[in-house]
Amino acid sequence: MLSQAKNGASIVGEWLTKPPAPCLYDRQLVWITLSLMITGLVIVTSASVPVATRLTGIPFYFALRHAFFLVCSLVIIAGVVQVPLSRWKQFSVPMLFLSIVLLIIVLLIGRSVNGAARWIPLGIFNLQPAEVAKLSLFIFLAGYLVRQYSQVRASFIGFIKPLAVLGVLAFLLLMQPDLGSFVVMFVTTVGMLFIAGAKLWQFLVMISGALLGIGLLIVFEPYRLRRVTSFLDPWEDPFGSGYQLTQSLMAFGRGELMGQGLGNSIQKLEYLPEAHTDFVFAVLGEELGLIGVTVVLLLIFALVFKALFIGRKCLQSGQLFGGFLACGFSFWFAFQTLVNVGAAIGMVPTKGLTLPLISYGGSSLFIMATAVGILLRIDHEQRLFAKYGPAESEELDDSGLNDSNNNDEQE
């Protein structure tokens, strides 16, 4: 039995790390992304019917919107994968400034939901600037680490500069308030600096300061303190501050091993708030059980592993910008998943973060799709670099992804 498990694990590992040689894009990454998107559409459709019926009278209102968002996301991936990495590096600073402007705008005219002003109405969907800020920060940080690589490794000044940028974004995010997005940005920034080779004592100072700051933010903000206390013992107040978590835990309890079956969730009947957004994982657990939960988590793990694997290949070949950015994306996907799943099962306080590529929400899907498109582009350019060398790969980059694939097929 153990040998069979090892053989199965080795087959999966080989599938993830050794795609067909003639291919100049990562097929496995495409299939993993499509699998997560389709899973998200199915679960969002099931989880959103009761609330959609009450709010709009159209049972599949949110499901149809989510399907539209998915189609747009696929178009975004197809477009982004054509953009050379040099363009993202070139425009990383303007993108960061645009994110700061959007974060200021949302404080002035943003739409408030549950006491947090996080969305800018744009007609067909509500833009969440925090999602744009995540992507912009990680692209900017990857470019900074390339430009100041030796300084980051040698001096505290090089280490502290990106934290100053993060501090500006943190201030604007906490004004909304959106502590969850800040925590994701902070952890991803720490991970990227670690990959770049910053000193250990610098991390200890930064993490200690961050923990102290987050603790003060929780203590001096009543609603955050209620979230933490309800997370520690939700059953103490199951109809008040602990209501959402207790309903989520009951959903997992009902799911057991095999689940209740698609469409058979009880908690989605408006017992569990935000069933199709922040707590879609609980509905998934109730309807598909432990087996379904495990499959979805393995898919997300495969996505994280792919990003990390692509980043490692780039760093080994000297393509630092793509390497740092791919590793940053892997930390982002992993930690945001950890927080979302942890909140649903009571391991961490509720943070209002979506489950990557699964939860309902246009902004989250579009930004995650952009990140996947950039990952595909990073992998594509790394393969060109490995196959043709630096000079020839740059010439092929200028002709676009499709031309490169056509040339490869002719060979």
Swiss-Prot record:
<feature type="transmembrane region" description="Helical">
    <location>
        <begin position="155"/>
        <end position="175"/>
    </location>
</feature>
<feature type="transmembrane region" description="Helical">
    <location>
        <begin position="290"/>
        <end position="310"/>
    </location>
</feature>
<feature type="region of interest" description="Disordered">
    <location>
        <begin position="391"/>
        <end position="411"/>
    </location>
</feature>
<feature type="topological domain" description="Cytoplasmic">
    <location>
        <begin position="143"/>
        <end position="154"/>
    </location>
</feature>
<feature type="topological domain" description="Periplasmic">
    <location>
        <begin position="342"/>
        <end position="354"/>
    </location>
</feature>
<protein>
    <recommendedName>
        <fullName>Probable peptidoglycan glycosyltransferase FtsW</fullName>
        <ecNumber>2.4.99.28</ecNumber>
    </recommendedName>
</protein>
<dbReference type="InterPro" id="IPR013437">
    <property type="entry name" value="FtsW"/>
</dbReference>
<keyword id="KW-0133">Cell shape</keyword>
<dbReference type="GO" id="GO:0009252">
    <property type="term" value="P:peptidoglycan biosynthetic process"/>
</dbReference>
<keyword id="KW-0997">Cell inner membrane</keyword>
<feature type="topological domain" description="Periplasmic">
    <location>
        <begin position="221"/>
        <end position="289"/>
    </location>
</feature>
<dbReference type="InterPro" id="IPR001182">
    <property type="entry name" value="FtsW/RodA"/>
</dbReference>
<keyword id="KW-0132">Cell division</keyword>
<feature type="transmembrane region" description="Helical">
    <location>
        <begin position="66"/>
        <end position="86"/>
    </location>
</feature>
<keyword id="KW-0131">Cell cycle</keyword>
<keyword id="KW-0472">Membrane</keyword>
<dbReference type="GO" id="GO:0008360">
    <property type="term" value="P:regulation of cell shape"/>
</dbReference>
<keyword id="KW-0573">Peptidoglycan synthesis</keyword>
<dbReference type="GO" id="GO:0005886">
    <property type="term" value="C:plasma membrane"/>
</dbReference>
<feature type="topological domain" description="Cytoplasmic">
    <location>
        <begin position="87"/>
        <end position="89"/>
    </location>
</feature>
<comment type="function">
    <text>Peptidoglycan polymerase that is essential for cell division.</text>
</comment>
<feature type="topological domain" description="Periplasmic">
    <location>
        <begin position="111"/>
        <end position="121"/>
    </location>
</feature>
<feature type="topological domain" description="Cytoplasmic">
    <location>
        <begin position="1"/>
        <end position="28"/>
    </location>
</feature>
<feature type="transmembrane region" description="Helical">
    <location>
        <begin position="321"/>
        <end position="341"/>
    </location>
</feature>
<dbReference type="Pfam" id="PF01098">
    <property type="entry name" value="FTSW_RODA_SPOVE"/>
</dbReference>
<dbReference type="InterPro" id="IPR018365">
    <property type="entry name" value="Cell_cycle_FtsW-rel_CS"/>
</dbReference>
<dbReference type="GO" id="GO:0071555">
    <property type="term" value="P:cell wall organization"/>
</dbReference>
<dbReference type="GO" id="GO:0015648">
    <property type="term" value="F:lipid-linked peptidoglycan transporter activity"/>
</dbReference>
<keyword id="KW-1003">Cell membrane</keyword>
<feature type="topological domain" description="Cytoplasmic">
    <location>
        <begin position="376"/>
        <end position="411"/>
    </location>
</feature>
<feature type="topological domain" description="Periplasmic">
    <location>
        <begin position="176"/>
        <end position="177"/>
    </location>
</feature>
<feature type="topological domain" description="Cytoplasmic">
    <location>
        <begin position="311"/>
        <end position="320"/>
    </location>
</feature>
<feature type="transmembrane region" description="Helical">
    <location>
        <begin position="122"/>
        <end position="142"/>
    </location>
</feature>
<feature type="topological domain" description="Cytoplasmic">
    <location>
        <position position="199"/>
    </location>
</feature>
<keyword id="KW-0328">Glycosyltransferase</keyword>
<keyword id="KW-0812">Transmembrane</keyword>
<feature type="transmembrane region" description="Helical">
    <location>
        <begin position="355"/>
        <end position="375"/>
    </location>
</feature>
<feature type="compositionally biased region" description="Acidic residues">
    <location>
        <begin position="392"/>
        <end position="411"/>
    </location>
</feature>
<keyword id="KW-0808">Transferase</keyword>
<feature type="transmembrane region" description="Helical">
    <location>
        <begin position="200"/>
        <end position="220"/>
    </location>
</feature>
<keyword id="KW-0961">Cell wall biogenesis/degradation</keyword>
<keyword id="KW-1133">Transmembrane helix</keyword>
